């Protein structure tokens, strides 16, 4: 409560809530979420659906139940796979069974075109070329799905590399340093250091991306 309330006092527009691991059944999960929100009052909140981390499966029906509370304004959709859930939520909204909420994808951006085609409004994730994510969203909004997919496909090898457990952040910081966006790629201990072989592989992918027109490097 103190952390959430402190963030709101400093100007945060809302908070993000995820169910605690170990909860059993929809009623227990929903009760936890609402109790967590009640501790901070009437602030808007984002429901994070990230079962890979929490071990909690949140169904589309549970999202609809949570959305009966007007404080729920967004779903952070990171179920894997979770595309059919997005379609189910948008279908319930169109049928008047729940209010419309915003949906932002995650998971490193690896399903961005598909998430957008299923009704997501955008994405909230980390990737060393965020401008590509914005480009894909703009192209999809303009009805240019093939162009969006082409722009996205150029980056898939690097997206895959960044998603490696343990190494992902080190790879992202290496790319950001190569781009001149940050001065140093080092991670705080106990973060890993990229081997010479891994660094060479990432640099090779960056060179290919640049040669194919997907990025400009200093």
PLM feature spans:
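Active-site beta->alpha loop and helix N-cap motifs at the rims of alpha/beta catalytic domains
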Residues: 1-57, 176, 215
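Helix-coil boundary/capping segments in enzymes
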Residues: 1-6, 100-101, 191
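C-terminal alpha-helical cap/extension of soluble enzyme domains
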Residues: 117-120, 127-218
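Catalytic alpha/beta core domains of metabolic enzymes, predominantly
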Residues: 50-156, 160-165
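Alpha-helix C-cap/termination motif
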Residues: 10, 39-40, 69, 92-96, ...
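Short secondary-structure transition/capping segments
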Residues: 2, 27-31, 87-88, 135-138, ...
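Conserved beta-strand edge residues that scaffold enzyme active sites
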Residues: 21-22, 81, 129, 190
């Amino acid at each position: 409560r103190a952390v959430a309330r402190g963030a709101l006092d400093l100007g945060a527009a809302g908070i993000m809530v995820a169910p605690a691991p170990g909860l059993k059944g929809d009623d227990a999960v929903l009760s936890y979420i609402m109790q967590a929100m009640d501790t901070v009052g009437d602030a808007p909140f984002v429901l994070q659906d990230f079962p890979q981390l929490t071990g909690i499966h949140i169904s589309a029906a549970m999202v609809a139940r949570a959305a009966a509370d007007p404080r729920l304004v967004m779903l952070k959709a990171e179920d894997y796979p979770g595309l059919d859930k997005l379609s189910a939520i948008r279908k319930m909204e169109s049928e008047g069974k729940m209010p419309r909420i915003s949906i932002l994808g995650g998971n490193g951006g690896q399903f961005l075109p598909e998430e957008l085609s299923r009704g997501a409004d955008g994405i909230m994730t980390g990737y060393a070329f965020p401008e590509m994510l914005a480009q894909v969203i703009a192209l999809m909004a303009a009805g240019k799905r093939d162009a969006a997919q082409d722009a996205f496909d150029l980056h898939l090898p690097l997206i895959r590399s960044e998603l490696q457990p343990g190494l992902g952040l080190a790879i992202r910081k290496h790319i950001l340093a190569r781009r001149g966006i940050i001065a140093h790629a080092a991670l705080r201990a106990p973060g890993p250091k990229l081997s010479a072989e891994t660094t060479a592989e990432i640099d090779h992918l960056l060179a290919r991306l640049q040669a194919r027109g997907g990025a400009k490097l200093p």
